[in-house]
């Protein structure tokens, strides 16, 4: 079905196509025809962060920023869906155009800039969702006009609002599209922010009588020293998990493309090697008690297996769906299933 719809979607501006695709998925869900888009995979229960995921393949943050399509997306067969990034207050994001397809590379460049309706709107949407068939992650960020010195208050506010509703919460400090945000990954800034949020997490756990895991999403543009520092902080503060990685600001594999000079984060196939390398290095530096989600460049079941081989417990897709459609979900689940059933038992590949 997606192969028939793709030419129409690709004839539209990327952001308009994004909106149309979501409306189509919603329509299929409401009319009971989701099976025409995607066959729900046989369950492959996977433990991580003290949770049991129906399968290890999730949707990365950014597709459903406001939590308006949760049930329709879960119906495609994802084991979990991550919504957001959401900020305390609504914001428009960056000026359009701000999303670009690079079909020759199966890639996307975006500079959306955390456009969202604000955390209160997201909370209302989540409360209306039925949430059958998978788990829900909520990705939180800061408003663009909040200085980094005050960022903790934005993250704390979002965490307090979504905590009762989320299965896990992701702290996004790695988007390249909010000025200065990635500075929060620097060791001292990271330690201050995550320490404060860990205290908030523990207080909220006591208040609500449940512990919601807190994950941190990192950039792919980290050198070895950056990775060492981040791993040291995240291990010291005992975060529940790490998502590796966000989009990249580098362009070595698409340097000759006319859109290479566009500002924003590059995702899709060209990100696979770089993001998987960061994933593997983090796995080597973090204790096994901190599971990793591998995301970046997954366009096939083999790509998902590469993430698992590098040390991921779970994976997420996003840009790959633009080029492959919802069938990518089941393909990834089945590829991971075959790997898990292989005689090697899914060992982590060495550095």
Curated annotation (Swiss-Prot):
It is a peripheral membrane protein. Keywords: Cell membrane, Flavoprotein, FMN, Membrane, Oxidoreductase, Pyrimidine biosynthesis. This is Dihydroorotate dehydrogenase (quinone). Pathway: Pyrimidine metabolism; UMP biosynthesis via de novo pathway; orotate from (S)-dihydroorotate (quinone route): step 1/1. NCBIfam families: PRK05286.1-1, PRK05286.1-2, PRK05286.1-4, PRK05286.2-5, pyrD_sub2. Binds 1 FMN per subunit. It is found in: Cell membrane. The keyword S-adenosyl-L-methionine does not apply. GO terms for biological process: 'de novo' pyrimidine nucleobase biosynthetic process; 'de novo' UMP biosynthetic process. InterPro entries: Aldolase_TIM, DHO_dehydrogenase, Dihydroorotate_DH_1_2, Dihydroorotate_DH_2, Dihydroorotate_DH_cat, Dihydroorotate_DH_CS. The active site is at residue 175. It comes from Xanthomonas oryzae pv. oryzae (strain KACC10331 / KXO85). One of its GO terms (molecular function) is dihydroorotate dehydrogenase (quinone) activity. Its EC number is 1.3.5.2.
